[in-house]
Amino acid sequence: MSNSEKNFLIGIVGPCGSGKSTLIASLEKHGYRCRHIAQEHSYVKYMWQRITNPDVLIFLECSYENSTSRRKLNWLPAEHEEQQRRLSHAREHAHLIINTNLLNPDEVLAHALTFLKENYQ
């Protein structure tokens, strides 16, 4: 895929610690345009559509245990559940959902690249 074919916008959404920043940096190295969507901090369920309106939405799943260990967060399970609630609308509209719990960053990137090449070439 040439860079001109990668002009669509990819939105990356997920709970804190799911790997959004890492995936964005990796996809950008491959020539993709990406945006971090901080939907986990918004009470407006469709805010991700209004502000970013991505052509492709990738949702990164991450458990409470992994979120808190990856980011050294001092959270209670209820805070993670609240993020999941705030993210539910974006998750329902995601083109790709990647469970990052058992994957390293290279494996997450491989899933995303395979999906993009198969569906957006």
Where do the model's predicted regions map?
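Small-molecule kinase domains that catalyze NTP-dependent phosphoryl transfer to phosphate-bearing small molecules
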Residues: 73-111
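Conserved substrate/cofactor phosphate-moiety recognition/catalytic segment
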Residues: 15, 25-55
